[in-house]
Amino acid sequence: MQLLLLFLLLVGPYVILTGLSRWTGFKTAAMIRARIGISLFFAFTALGHFIRAEEMSAMLPPAVPYRLQIVFVTGILELLGASALWVPDLMRPTGTCLILMLVWFLPANIYSAIYRIDFGGHGAGPAYLLVRIPFQLFLMWWIYWATEQNWLEKKASGM
């Protein structure tokens, strides 16, 4: 259920603003509509890092030191990312950093699903990963597109 809410936060503004632009004639660039959703997504998920920090820290293996501090720092990074998307000179590097952060978070999501940590759907066990991993890949692609990344194209054309 939480992933559905996150998906709606992510793509809802794009869909709503696209509909409004067709109805009212008010035009907004597609990538701006997408970045609104990305900002809402990361602002919302950052709140969890502060409101439910103890529960979120359980998503990290016990051997990881400073788990609670890591949760707070990553929450701050998510808020900074949500904001920095709107600074023109920072948009692309912020997009890259958000994608890398999502790659960095994936092992915690896998760990918490395997050990059924009861936070954000992970209590469902490994089956949750059948939904979570494709969602995370979609999220990374959405950020890549909305922040006008081109490093995949550069790599492909250099081959």
Name these PLM-found stretches:
Residues 1-159:
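Membrane-interface extramembranous regions
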